[in-house]
């Protein structure tokens, strides 16, 4: 496996005859996962509105127009620009002997030359001067709401406080069946059919804190938005209970431990 991956890093040849059918597969994947999926479509457009200068505004798979106009040369140029050992990390997990592993890595990757990578420019967003709103028209049985706030990412694991607080906030709102959104909006007021919160601290650029959900039958997007904002306001005014905080801390620690149960989980964590 290591020999094959090393060869692919150094000697990949892209063939025009193979490229065209593979590109069609990617285009169909985009249609299935995004264009025919109202929730995914909402989040794609949310990112395009939330971010003005950062590459996060563009979907990873690209817009359909990008795929329509992509050539073998585009792909080959990208490969030559970024596929290099000085831009790669080799992760191996499992029952391996580290001395043997280092020997194999040196054998197969050691001869691949490094090269100068394209310059990475600062990824700084211009100041946002007001609320941005977007309506997405797509076939769906129920309307769907997503709200996002630009928030700090984790830069210094020892000094940063806000990212950890945001993780706890997301868990208090949507970490378990007894969390506030499920308890108050879904089962309590019955305003929402579903409601959630999310935050990712480990990003290169700015992160987003997200609240989302679907209104219950007979309720509107406006009512759901007001209810979600109301839950945030209650925490701002009254905080969270000691019991809530203890529970989500325990859940967060347990989640980190459970990642070690699978090889893939360990590899992705590294």
Segments predicted by a language model, with ranges:
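M16 family metallopeptidases and their MPP-like homologs
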Residues: 1-9, 38-65, 87-93, 143-156, ...
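Short beta-strand/turn micro-motifs at beta-sheet edges
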Residues: 76-80, 132-136, 195-201
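Secretory-pathway/luminal and periplasmic proteins that interact with or process carbohydrate-rich
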Residues: 11-14, 31-38, 52-57, 111-118, ...
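Active-site-adjacent, His/Asp/Glu-enriched structural segments that form or flank metal-binding
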Residues: 1-40, 54-55, 66-87, 97-100, ...
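Bilobed periplasmic-binding protein/Venus flytrap-like ligand-binding cleft at the lobe interface
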Residues: 166-176, 228-235
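Active/ligand-binding-proximal structured segments within catalytic/core domains
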Residues: 158-173, 182-183
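An aromatic/glycine/proline-enriched structural segment found at the starts
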Residues: 52, 60, 89-155, 259-260
């Amino acid at each position: 496996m290591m020999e094959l991956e090393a060869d692919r890093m150094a000697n990949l040849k892209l063939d025009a005859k193979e490229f065209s059918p593979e590109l069609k597969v990617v285009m169909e994947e985009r249609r299935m996962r995004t264009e025919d999926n109202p929730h995914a479509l909402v989040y794609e457009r949310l990112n395009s509105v939330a971010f003005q200068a950062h590459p996060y505004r563009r979907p990873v798979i690209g817009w359909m127009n990008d795929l329509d106009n992509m050539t073998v040369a585009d792909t080959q140029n990208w490969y030559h620009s970024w596929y290099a050992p000085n831009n790669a990390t080799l992760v191996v997990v499992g029952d391996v002997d580290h001395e043997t592993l280092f020997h194999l890595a040196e054998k197969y990757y050691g001869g691949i030359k490094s090269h100068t990578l394209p310059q990475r420019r600062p990824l700084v967003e211009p100041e946002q001067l007001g609320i941005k709103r977007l309506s997405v028209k797509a076939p769906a049985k129920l309307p769907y709401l997503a709200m996002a706030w630009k928030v700090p990412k984790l830069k210094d694991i020892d000094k940063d406080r806000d990212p950890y607080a945001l993780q706890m906030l997301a868990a208090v709102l949507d970490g378990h069946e007894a969390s506030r959104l499920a308890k108050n909006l879904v089962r309590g007021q019955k305003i929402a059919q579903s409601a959630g919160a999310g935050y990712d601290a480990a990003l290169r650029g700015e992160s987003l804190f997200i609240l989302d959900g679907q209104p219950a039958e007979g309720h509107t997007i406006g009512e759901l938005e007001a209810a979600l904002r109301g839950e945030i306001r209650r925490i701002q005014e009254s905080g969270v209970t000691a019991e809530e905080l203890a529970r989500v801390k325990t859940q967060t620690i347990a989640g980190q431990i459970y990642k070690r149960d699978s090889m893939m989980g360990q590899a992705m964590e590294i």
